[in-house]
Amino acid sequence: MGFDYAIVHVKYTIPPAVLLTLLYRPLFTKLDAFKVLFLVTVAVTATIPWDSYLIRTNIWSYPDHVVIGPTLLDIPLEEVFFFFIQTYNTTLLYLILSKPTFQPAYLRAGRPTASSPWKYQKLAGQLFLVGATVWAGLRVHENAKGTYTGLIVVWAAPIILLQWTLAYQFILGLPWTNTVLPIAIPTLYLWLVDTLALRRGTWVISPGTKYGVHLWDGLEIEEALFFFVTNTLIVFGQLAFDNALAVLYTFPALFPKPPSMPTPLDLINALWVSPYKYDRARLAGLQDAVLRLKRKSRSFYLASATFPGPLRSDLLLLYSFCRVADDLVDNAATAEEAKEWISKLHQYLDLVYSDAKSSTVSEDFVQAHFPSDARSALLQLPAHKLPRQPLQDLLHGFEMDLAFNTSSPIKTETDLRLYSERVAGTVAQMCIELIFRLYPSNMTSGEERKVVDAGNQMGMALQYVNIARDISVDAHIGRVYLPLDWLQESGLTYDEVLISPEGARMESLRMRLLEKAFSIYDGARGAIETLPVEARGPIRVAVESYMEIGRTLRQKGYTVRAGRATVSKWRRVIVAWRTLNKSIA
């Protein structure tokens, strides 16, 4: 009896588990818990018979003086715990590293007429894994130096073959931070741990079953292979799981009402869907939306990673529509062209919300009247989940922007509130509408209306922060969004601000606007607590990530630099993590 193996866990496997749990705790969802439980169960039950065979055939052994004593099918309990803790740690690391990635954007629809390399890559992987399995079987049959290596490969390769066959596109298509990194980090770490354990004799490989080759002093090649293969199994299992979820939640035509907690049968059905059946137009819309969000709003892109899958898709598509509509108007060469774009957008909404018109009519209108890079955003707008009025009001906000060509439309604080409500409050309102559509609550319609109205107010607060940050940027394009009566009270004229948007008086006005923003924010944030639990934390992140810009601007001595982010990426990440932690406290 001894505690050497138990001490390995105390020193090297449990501390990472605690750290990863604390890091991911604010983001942990019921679906994540299901993933972890599912993968741990599969990993432990699949490994126990294999490891038991190794021990009973003396390929692998644990000296009596290094283990406490209790066993399961001849496997020391410390080893059984290792199966659990390795899977848990690698799974959590994968969840952390993959969280920022909007994975459905990496699905690829098949084209019957295209000579895609995907099928050849799939076949190459299958042939390699089948060949490895055959080679491993021969090594086991020989019962010589390659026996342990053969047993590792003949056990793992068929499972990896199944994972590859079902999810090869996802495995090949996702960023390396979702695939290579979650395999490499725990593998390297366990190589170091194993080096220490083998040197101390915590576990022993029978000399006649190994090649005697070391990756480095203290790490035998078989052990290096074992940790690489097992971490690959875990991560590929996660990728197959997420591939299935992406299909379930991305294509409403294929899965009109996907369950929030899918069964294994749901996952298998999703993985068996041919890529030729994927909705290419919807995929293109999501891919375009992700690119726009990355370029235009880093704060919201960070916040979007915290939203559940189906809601995240709808929010991305909504943002994409709003962004494209805004760009069409802002980038117009003349005021007349901008008015034409607004008119066309009004016509598009008429078609979309008209009961008498088919979707084909609106699609034909978009194809005929909008540039190619704007079409997917319009056609993929989840209009069937949204009321028309907020979208109409958004266009009225663009019309207020055009009024700057003649005179400022923002003469009083009332005008400022109206403008902010139209261009930002409406967007926040639509976000809340989508949340209630996806996650029905027990509220009455009146109570839901109050929450939607509070969302509108919160959007106004965020727009105030945006205006406060961009005073100089806006002045350079000939616009001042501060009320004219505020300027008069400070002894300034509109033209003076256009020429010189800096100085003590302008800083005073910036602080005044921020005070208003935080006052509105304080009045509206209580409504967030009544949102469905699935969206409550993510909405907090979206709000706090932006309000952190306001807090930064209010810091004494802070200098605004036009065109530069006021909050660093890491500070936004910390704000998001703290916000989510508070939401579960």
UniProtKB/Swiss-Prot annotation:
It comes from the Eukaryota. Pathway: Carotenoid biosynthesis; beta-carotene biosynthesis; Carotenoid biosynthesis; phytoene biosynthesis; all-trans-phytoene from geranylgeranyl diphosphate: step 1/1. Its main location: membrane. It is found in: Membrane. Residues 250-585 are annotated as: Phytoene synthase. InterPro entries: Isoprenoid_synthase_dom_sf (IPR008949), Lycopene_cyclase_dom (IPR017825), Squ/phyt_synthse (IPR002060), Squalene/phytoene_synthase_CS (IPR019845), Trans_IPPS_bact-type (IPR044843), Trans_IPPS_HH (IPR033904). PANTHER family: BIFUNCTIONAL LYCOPENE CYCLASE/PHYTOENE SYNTHASE. The keyword Transmembrane helix applies. Bifunctional enzyme that catalyzes the reactions from geranylgeranyl diphosphate to phytoene (phytoene synthase) and lycopene to beta-carotene via the intermediate gamma-carotene (lycopene cyclase). Its EC number is 5.5.1.19, 2.5.1.32. In the N-terminal section; belongs to the lycopene beta-cyclase family. In the C-terminal section; belongs to the phytoene/squalene synthase family. This is Bifunctional lycopene cyclase/phytoene synthase. It comes from Phaeosphaeria nodorum (strain SN15 / ATCC MYA-4574 / FGSC 10173). Residues 1-243 are annotated as: Lycopene beta-cyclase. GO terms for biological process: carotenoid biosynthetic process. Keywords: Carotenoid biosynthesis, Isomerase, Membrane, Multifunctional enzyme, Transferase, Transmembrane, Transmembrane helix. It catalyses: all-trans-lycopene = gamma-carotene; gamma-carotene = all-trans-beta-carotene; 2 (2E,6E,10E)-geranylgeranyl diphosphate = 15-cis-phytoene + 2 diphosphate. It is a multi-pass membrane protein. The chain crosses the membrane at residues 3-23, 35-55, 75-97, 123-141, 151-171, 173-193, 221-241. One of its GO terms (molecular function) is squalene synthase [NAD(P)H] activity. GO terms for cellular component: membrane. NCBIfam families: CarR_dom_SF (TIGR03462). It holds the Pfam family SQS_PSY.
